[in-house]
Every structure is written in structure tokens, then in C-alpha cells.
Amino acid sequence: MALSSFCSSDGSDPLWDWNVTWHTSNPDFTKCFQNTVLTWVPCFYLWSCFPLYFLYLSRHDRGYIQMTHLNKAKTALGFFLWIICWADLFYSFWERSQGMLLAPVLLVSPTLLGITMLLATFLIQFERRKGVQSSGIMLTFWLVALLCALAILRSKIISALKKDAQVDMFRDSAFYLYFTLVFIQLVLSCFSDSSPLFSETVRDPNPCPESSASFLSRITFWWITGMMVQGYRQPLKSSDLWSLNKEDTSEEVVPVLVNNWKKECVKSRKQPVRIVYAPPKDPTKPKGSSQLDVNEEVEALIVKSSHKDRDPSLFKVLYKTFGPYFLMSFLYKALHDLMMFAGPEILELIINFVNDREAPDWQGYLYTALLFVSACLQTLALHQYFHICFVTGMRIKTAVVGAVYRKALVITNSARKSSTVGEIVNLMSVDAQRFMDLATYINMIWSAPLQVTLALYFLWLNLGPSVLAGVAVMILMVPFNAVMAMKTKTYQVAHMKSKDNRIKLMNEILNGIKVLKLYAWELAFQDKVMNIRQEELKVLKKSAYLAAVGTFTWVCTPFLVALSTFAVFVTVDEKNILDAKKAFVSLALFNILRFPLNILPMVISSIVQASVSLKRLRIFLSHEELEPDSIERWSIKDGGGMNSITVKNATFTWARDEPPTLNGITFAIPDGALVAVVGQVGCGKSSLLSALLAEMDKVEGHVTLKGSVAYVPQQAWIQNDSLRENILFGRPLQEHCYKAVMEACALLPDLEILPSGDLTEIGEKGVNLSGGQKQRVSLARAVYCNSDIYLLDDPLSAVDAHVGKHIFEKVVGPMGLLKNKTRILVTHGISYLPQVDVIIVMSGGKISEMGSYQELLDRDGAFAEFVRTYANTEQDLASEDDSKNGVSGLGKESKPVENGILVTDAVGKPLQRHLSNSSSHSVVTNQQHSSTAELQKSGVKEETWKLMEADKAQTGQVKLSVYWNYMKAIGLCISFLSIFLFLCNHVSALASNYWLSLWTDDRPAVNGTQENRNFRLSVYGALGILQGVAVFGYSMAVSIGGIFASRRLHLDLLQNVLRSPMSFFERTPSGNLVNRFSKELDTVDSMIPQVIKMFMGSLFSVIGAVIIILLATPIAAVIIPPLGLVYFFVQRFYVASSRQLKRLESVSRSPVYSHFNETLLGVSVIRAFEEQERFIRQSDLKVDENQKAYYPSIVANRWLAVRLECVGNCIVLFAALFAVISRHSLSAGLVGLSVSYSLQITAYLNWLVRMSSEMETNIVAVERLKEYSETEKEASWQIQETAPPSTWPHSGRVEFRDYCLRYREDLDLVLKHINVTIEGGEKVGIVGRTGAGKSSLTLGLFRINESAEGEIIIDGINIAKIGLHNLRFKITIIPQDPVLFSGSLRMNLDPFSQYSDEEVWMALELAHLKGFVSALPDKLNHECAEGGENLSVGQRQLVCLARALLRKTKILVLDEATAAVDLETDDLIQSTIRTQFEDSTVLTIAHRLNTIMDYTRVIVLDKGEIRECGAPSELLQQRGVFYSMAKDAGLV
């Protein structure tokens, strides 16, 4: 009553009147309702939003937008609206002053509306100042205001049309003007304002249009339409992609995660374990002695912190970093879930309307409109939710990849052993992807229970306590699902472990492929990969069985819930009638229930997978980091007067839980000194340099360095970039300095050889450079950086005597470019030693002697004894200044020197060195040096010489042949059986629902019961059982078929890659191949079978829904075909772009892995040059490039879904509309069936297109696997028809007949018309300058490259006519770069297990390794690290010698095999070869000419041609090329 008096002066105007508004054929709202509710609703909306929105804008300033015409118009209209409201208010005051009785509402409403319009105007300007280009808050406000005004407008028009209507001219005119202005404001709010000043969008040449899109465009994803149109017209290219939004870039995302992780680690008080090394107590040792004997065991005392640490929580860190943005998705999801239940409730109203023949028609149309609007709102809310989830997932992946990359740059060497390259790549690819996938569905953890609870609540209202039967079924399923989740986790862990092992092995195979081919070991390693793959597939098969059972329970649970509920409902009381309303409203609710019940186990499974990945990432990110602070660094100006390097009583170790590698190191080096470090293999020379670089853990002592450091590793690390960029290494080009460095490092002649000079791309790991060229590039990089301290780890080993002498004189020596720099040179060359300032003699991890050359000779210690012995025994071959004579023999027992350090026996008990190769503490990377560098320069343009082929994206539609290939890989029987079972499942589902509609139409008997109840129930149950059997069958068939396909596709890929020629690996970045074996194969393993199941399910569901709608309302046939056409067009329109975006994303992913691999291999070089930040930026850039393709693809999904769901919503609209129109001729059961199916069709259509797109985008993985399964292959491995006899070659006679060789068809010859015959048993040396064609000759002999012309005859057989393995098994090579693989030492010697242990031990003894291997705890089963890291380079070289001794073939090739070892090791190898290969033909490519002076012949190559050939003594007499080389080496 009070409200009536508030609305009218006489209290005659109620707020609500059912007779006026509902029970009438011409409904209207009361005046009071119009003046209060319809006027106040927009006001209350804006005022309720204002506080939070104002706070949000205050904290998120995006910049200042200049006043534009659009903004001026909106502001002006806001003032006009305010004026209209105040005019209405003043008019009311005027009326009151005239004595009229006015209702209070006429004063209150204009006042409230006027203040609200003022607030709206203020917000328009405040948004402009804060950089808001389009406001969702304001657009919603104007929309609500317009809708409310529209109802009032209709009422005013109806009133005005009445004859006796009283017209209030002023108020009506004011309202019409108000309505017009609100409509204009709404239209203007649909447009976006200009970009803020100084924003990223203004500066970006290709900005993402999202940032400047209007609110309406953003919620409908209209802003991406331009790209979709472009993609439909022609295939998208990477240049068409927009820049990432700033908030999605690595620059923004990664630092936040890394900082939060650091804070979490501090909170968890995760202190590293301290390890104190102490000797065992020895009562016989003098009390004052502090030095340890190398042979004494060292105890490690592990001192743990007193309090128990908890592990840092990565989940907390992820939540803290991404939670706030992600929380917005909660609101959208909650809104969507609530709107979802509007459908069944409106369905109930429609069924009641159909049953009520007296109800006015407009109510049916209203219900139809409500159903359509609720469906549309549901669509918009759902896809905003998905968009936020996908963007969050993308950001998480970016952050995780960035964090892993940054961590990989700083972890310790012991940590690197526990995380191999393959495992870290998996962290970046598979584990990061798991988080991405989980972000989409994690909200289902709370949403699914909410949906289930609401569904059960509405079911209780509909069916009463009978619903408890359904609840009981669901509760019974909980423990079952829990057990399955635990099992899934177990299988997931096992699967990831197998995958890590496989990727690790594949990485090693790809890095060592050249060695595998030379040894003909491809089959052995193929078997190793397949064994791991077999274990992986076993786990996948178990997971498939589990998935089949899971799918069976998930699909059948909703049906069992419905069956049990209906059964209890109709049997508990005979009077309970299952009518259309109860059945189909319940069925609609059961359909809602189906999704959370189906998705929840999948979400649990995803969470389980993500938890495994979370743990793996946490372990990796928790690895101990190197401590650069362990070495004190001073700048030149701050450290004046100090020595350049000072080391006091320092002890270093490679791993904290292992004994030290270097003990009691003490020395000081003044500024500008040249220091040589000499010693035997494995004595700690390279470790000393690594210690100075802070690559090792310092146990005790003090180390100080003054100035910047440059480092040249023992094995050169080369990037996949141009020669120039490898030398500049991120520094600006200074032409004069650059040329001086190139000349000093003897690189100018090489520029003539390279096709595009220093702009030639030199390939991944420098594949097209020789070993010497790579070493000189590495040296040039260091020299160019102009540092203060140079650490040079044997840089002269891989170059010939002439070049070595040149480099020492021009770069390292007293008159070289570095003459004023502090230099520490690890070397084996005696001739350099008289010119150095200080010599450090290493032995057993200690400094045995130290002093100048003359001081050490005067001291008459081990060094002096060696020099005298060497001079006496070798004087017939070399003078004392032989530039390549090695420093060795320094490990032999000698009397104790002054500081009490013993020099231990070299062979007796060598120190096992963890990392002589300190270039990267990783895989040996240089094995792939091909002599492409020996090409003649022939005016090839710069842009034509790209050695490495970037990963290419296919274009256009995925060919049907790809699907057919996948079906064949599955097996055609299984494929067609799966389709048949899918059909059975959906036919039985349709039949059961149609049966239900017939059941609901049964008329109750006179006594109020249904006569056919039990029959109906039995058939309904039987159809459900048939559905369950079909579900289990197709799920099992698809899963098992998927495993068959995965096995076949992997095998094809592996076999083809291993059978590819070396040229394939030289031009294909390893990242491309790793991508195929990791991400693409994971898609085939895990994704494609799931997508097939969902695609087939969606397809049959859509067909079924259309059939039901057409059966119920045949008139729908008028609208279904046009909507079908729209659907088809939108789908094809979308797929064209989506498919190409997926391809571009896949292609841009490969460089991320390639760069990551490259970084891991050269991490110590990067750290030494302090280039971490530059490499981090490069990595971030590559990740962002990858996400540039991914982001449009997820938005395209949303674009499609919104449009297709609109098509689906139209089907709902027309199904309900036709049901309302035909209500007099339709039964309630058919109406219920039709509308309930139409409610589902939106989801089905959405899933169908998503799954068809997912199918096409994921099948791209098959396409990409097939791409590398069909590349050109090298010649057959075995040819039975031409296989040589087992005794071949019996003498070892090798004949080159007019032999020519080129590396590619478009390149020049590198060997030109070689004609030479080498008799069986001859020992032939092959010499020549760098790039002369020496290595090319061996590549031709092993047919790594096939001949361009001519032939090679071995013992009468043309090697081109026999199989490659027939050839390569019969020739042995000891390569320049010794490559070992992870696995046992025995496997590295004999991968085919052809030889007995006795034969292996004999080979080790002859290779001088027996003592070393015997001292190892596991002997032959000693586990070699990845790339043989835990052996020194010299020890690895001796392992290669042992391989050759085991094979004992008639032809042996040494490709600069002793270049990187000291003279003693060289002598050991040479003496073994002379005795053990006495009857064999030996071809030696040599830099140390003294090793071939006793050979029968020497071949001198120059520019691919034989210049000289003859006995060494003859060639010396000729005084030609060989004589000049011998002279440079000091041999004449």
C-alpha cells in the first residue's frame, strides 16, 4: 500500500498486477513498475559497479587518450541526458507549485536518473584519461537503460493509441528524446576510441587489433575476422601474424614468475647441503702436513642444516603469478553455470504451455525468446571464460619455458648430469603444455560439483526422493574413479620417464649421427630406441585399457543415474506417472549432469598429469646453481696493483658429493703474463680453466680475477649463424679490428673457400667447417671481444704446424695481438714453452711444478727429465723447437718436489676426470664436421647460401592421403569396426530417448497407473546396456588402434631418419628433428585417439539431434538446411585459417628447441663471455614468435565457437518456436524430446567443429612425421646380390680412379680427379693445408658422400656397387672428435655384443685403458655420461682406438685422431697401430708430421688435387709443398 501511495497521489497504481501483466492477451506493466523498477534498474547497476570499477581504473592506467569526436559526442550526449532528467524534475516542481498533487516517484526517479547520468558522463571522461578505448561497463549500462526504456516506450505507444488517452506532452516528449539519446549512446559505445598516447600499439608496426577493439568486438571476437578472411583467401604466412599483446610477452611474464619462485625458495629456507672434505685419520702422518696424497681416499662429511626444510611450492608460485587474472574466469564460469539451468526450467514452462490449451500464444513466444536469450548469454559467458583460461595457459607456458631456459644457464654440472638435454627439452615441450591444457579445465574442480549439486536440486524438485537412487550410483562411482586416477598417475610417471629416456637417446643419436654412420652402428641404436619405445608403448597400452574402462563408466554413468532414478520413481509408487514434463525436464537435467560427470575424471586425470609435471619442474628449478661469487672478480680500475689471477690453496670439485678434482692449487699470475699449463691426459688442465671460470664448485681457498675473461674451449662451440656473427658474438662490428683478428687467426684464406665469405651460414654446430676452422673461429671470437684475461684450452691442437705457428706468433705469443693480455694456454707443444713467462705442470689434479722454462730445467725435476729424454730419443726426427711436439711423460713417478706434491703414475692409477671438455659440459658437438668448407668460392650470392633449412609449414587443406595413411597405420579393420561401434552406440542412445517419449505419452489407466510400465522400463534399460557395450568397444578399438598407428609412424620416422644421408643432417636443424620425436609424436600418442573419439561422438550426436528435431517438427526442415549451410561455410572459413595457424605454430616451435639445444651445448662459453642476457633475450624472442601463431589460433577457436553456437541457438529458437506454433497437433512427449535435443545441439555443434578443427590441426602431426619419413635415403645398407665375401678385403688394396666428389649438386667439386693406388699393408699419410680435401677423401672412402665421377676399388670390388654396411663394417676409422654415447663402456665398444669380455679386455689393454677401466667400480659396465662427459678427451680417444682394435679390419683410417692429445698418448696410439695393424692398410690424416715420417708414402693434397705423392724422404728431397710443411714443423 505504501508503494502504491509512493507511485500515485491517490494510491491507485500498484507495483504489480497479474491481470494487467500476465493473465491477458495484451500484456503491459503498471505505471508504478515503469516509474520505479524500469527506471531504477540501470541506475542501481551503474552505482553498484562504480566503486570497484573506479578502483580498477585508478590502478590500471593505460595512458592518456586525446579528446576525439567520438568522446566529445558521448560527453555531450551525457550532459543532454542529465539536462533532460533535471528538466523532468523541475517540471515536477513547477507542477507542484501550481497546486497539483504529485506522486513522490515523479520527484525521486528524475533525481536518481539525473545523478546517474552525471556519473555516466564523469566515467566517460575518467575512462578516457585512463586509456580505456571501449568500456564494457558503460555499454552494458546503456543497453540496460535502453531495454528498460523500450518497455516504457511500448506502454506509452499503446496508451497513446487509445481513444480516451490522456497525454502528458512535456513528459512524453522528454521521454522520446531521452530514449533517442540513450539509443545513440548505445550505438556510440559500440565503437572504440583512438589508442592512448605513447602506447605500444602506436609504436608497433603490426599491432594486435584486440587492444583497440570495442567491447562488443571483444566479446564476440569480431576483431580477428580480418585475419580469418585473409586466411580463407590465401594461406597465412608468418609475416601476416600480429605482434603479441605486451602483457602476454616473455618480457612481462617470465620475470614475475622467476622473482616469485626465488621468494618462495627463500621462504622454504631451502639451504644447499654443505660438504666438507676431510682425509681419513692417519696416525703415521706428520701433524703439520696439510697436503693430501692423490692416492689417499677422501671422506666427504655431509653437514645438513639443523631444521627440516620443506620443498618450495611451484603451485603457489604459479597461483601467485597468474591467479589474479585467472580469477576473472571464475565469474564468467559461475554466470555460465547458472544460465545453463535456465534451459530445463524454460523447457518445463514450454511443456506446461503446450499442455495448457487456454494459455495465450504470446507466453509461448516469450518462453522461446527467453530460451534464445539465455542461450546467447550462456555462449558469451562461456567463451569469455575459455578465452581467459587459454590466455592464462599460454602465459604459464611462456613463463615456464623462460624459467627453465634461465635455470639451464646457471645449474651446476652435477645437476646437468641428472637433467639431460632430452629431459630439459621435455620440460619445455610436454610438461609446459600440460599446464597449458590444465588451465582450460581447472575451474571444473569447483564448477563440476556446483553443476551436479544444482542438477540434483532441480531433479529433487521434479522427481522427489527418487533422485537419491541416482545419487547412490554416482557415489558408487567415486572410489572407482579414484582408483583409476591413481593408476593413471602411475602410468603417467612411467610414460614420462620412458619418453625422457627416448628423447635423450635420440638427441645423442642426432648429435653423433656421423660416427654412427662411419661405424655402421645405426641398427644397434635403432634397436636401443625401439626397446625404450616398446616400454613406452606398454605403458600407453595399459593407459588405453584404463581409458576404455573410464570412457565406459563416464558415458554410462548419466544413463545409469537416469535409469535408476526413473525406475525407483515409477516402482516406488504405482501412482507415480512418468509424464513428459517429468521425463524431459529430468532428461535435460541429466544431459547437464552428463558433462560434469564426464569431464571431472578427465580434469582429475589432467591434474594428475600436471602434478607429475609440476614435480618434475620443481625438481629442475630447485637444482643447485653455480656460485659465480665463489670467485672474486675485480674490474681493472678497482684492482690496480693486484695480480691478474690469484689462487690460494684452492680445492675444486665437479660435484659436491664427490671427491675433489683439483687439490691445493696455489699460484699468482701478474698482468700481461703468458702462462702455459702442461701435463698428461686427465691430469686436470681443462679443469683448472673451468675452475677459474667458476664452472666448478670451490670447496675451499681463495680465487681472485682482475678484469674481463674470454675463453676458448678445447672443443669449439659454433652457433647456427654466419661466420661473422659467430666471431662478433653480439658485439658491434669494428671493421679494422675485425680484419686484424681474421688475419691473425688465419681465417682470411678460408673466406675464399666459403661460398659467401664471412656471411656464409656455417650451420648447426659448424657442420660445414673442418675441425681446425672451427677452432680458429672459436679463437677469433675470443680475440675480438678484447678481454683482459684469456683462458685458452689447447686451441692449437686441431690445426696443422704452419697454421699453429702463425696463430702463436700473431695471436698468443709475445708479439701477438694479445701480448698485453693475461693468457693461460693449455698446450702440448714444447716449442712454445721457451717463449712463455710461466709454466704450470699439472699432475693428478695438483700443480707438481711451476716456474719459467729455464727454472724448471734448472730444477731438474720431472719436466726437465722429460725434455732431456724426449730430445735424445727424437732428435733424428725433430729439433727441440718442434712446434707440435707434445708435453708428456710428466706423469711418471718422480721424487717429491719442494711443496710435497707427488707426481703420480699416468697409466697406473689416473685421476678420473669428470670434464676435460669444459666447452659445455655436455655432448661432444663437433662430430659432424663436413668438409663443405672446402668448397671453392664461385660468386654465389649471399642470400643463396643458406645451409640449414628452416622448418617449413605446409599450406592448404590437409590432404586426404594423410587421414588414409593414419587409418592404414591403425589398421583398416579396426578403423571400420570403430565407426560401426560408434554408430551402434548413438543409434541405441536415440532409440532409448525416443522410447522414453513414447513412454511419457502412454495414457494413465483408470486407476491412475501406466499399464506398460515394466515393459517400457525393461526396453529402456536394455537399450542402455547396448549403448554401454558399444561405448566400451569403440573406446577400446580407437585406443588400441592409436597405439598401433603410433608404433608404425615412429618406426617409419626413426628408420628413415637413420637411413638419411649426412647431407640431410647438415641442412636440417636438430631442433626440427627433436620436435618431431617429442611434441609431434606426443600428439600422435596421446591427443589424436582422444580427438577421434570426441569428433566421432560429436558427429553422430549432431546427426541424431537433427533427426529427432525433424521427426518431432517436420516444419523444421525449412530452416535446418539454411542453418546447415551457414554452419558449413563458417566451419570451412575457420578451418582454412586455423589449420595454417597450427602449422605456423608448429614451425615456429622448432627454433625454440634448436636454440635451447645450442645454448645447452655452449653454456660455459656463454657464461665465460657473460652473454647470458643476450641469449635469454633471443630465447624469449623465439618463444614470443611461437606464441604469435598460437594466440590467433586460440582466438580463432573462440571466434568460431561464438558463431556456431549462434547457429545452434537459432536451432533452439526455431525448434521451440515450431513447437509453440504446432502445439495443438504435437504431443507433450515429442515437444519435450525435440526441445531437449535442440538444447544439446548447440554444445554438439560447438564440439563438432572444435573437434573437426582439432582433428585437422592434430593430424598435422602425422603430416609432419610423414614429411621426414619420406625424405631421400642414402644407398641400401645391405645388397645381397653384390655382397662381398666375408674375407673381403683380404689385402686392403685401395685404388682411386679419376675420383671426384662434391657435397651438393649445385656446388663445386671438392676432390678433383684423384688417381692413386695404395697397396695392401701400406702406411700412407695424407697431409695438406686446411680445406685441401683431406677429410673429404675419407668421407668418400666411407661413402658418406657419393662420388660425382670416378670410382674407388678395394681389392677388386667397386665400393659403389655394394651395400653401405657391407662397406663400412669392413673399414675402421678413428675420428678426430671422439664420440661416446650414454650407456655402459662395453656398449660404447661393442654395441652389437659381437665380442666376448676377454676380447674387449684385450682391446682395452692394447689401447692402454685396462688400468683405468680396472680401477672403475663397475669395470666394463661403467656408465658413460651423455657425450662421454665423465671421461677426458684423451681417454675418449683411447676408447675409439679400442673400438678399432676390436674390429681389426684390413683398412684403418685415422682422421687427425691424435690432434687433441699429448705426445705420450700420441706415441701410445702410434705404437699400438704399428704393432696391431702391421698387415693392414693405414691411411692417416695428420697435422703432426713426425707421426707419419716413417710411413711408406705421403699424399699431399691442395685444393682438392694431389700435388705430391711419394715416400717422405723423396718428397723432402724434392723441396716442394711437403718440404715447406716439414720446415714449418721444424722437422728439417
From Swiss-Prot:
PROSITE patterns: ABC_TM1F (PS50929), ABC_TRANSPORTER_1 (PS00211), ABC_TRANSPORTER_2 (PS50893), ALDOKETO_REDUCTASE_3 (PS00063)
UniProt modification remark: Glycosylated.
Domain ABC transporter residue range list: 645-869, 1294-1528
Residue positions binding ATP 2: 1328-1335
Glycosylation sites: 19
GO cellular component, one term: lateral plasma membrane
Cytoplasmic side: 55-74, 122-133, 194-317, 386-441, 487-548, 613-967, 1048-1090, 1134-1204, 1249-1532
Effect noted on mutating residue 1106 to C: No effect on estradiol glucuronide transport
Residues bearing the modification N6-succinyllysine: 504
Cross-referenced InterPro entries: AAA+_ATPase, ABC1_TM_dom, ABC1_TM_sf, ABC_transporter-like_ATP-bd, ABC_transporter-like_CS, ABC_transporter_C-like, Aldo/ket_reductase_CS, MRP
Expressed in which tissues: Skeletal muscle, brain, heart, spleen, lung and kidney.
Activity regulation remarks: MK 571 inhibits sphingosine 1-phosphate and leukotriene C4 export.
Name listed for the protein in its UniProt record: Multidrug resistance-associated protein 1
Annotated organism of origin: Rattus norvegicus (Rat)
Organism lineage string: Eukaryota, Metazoa, Chordata, Craniata, Vertebrata
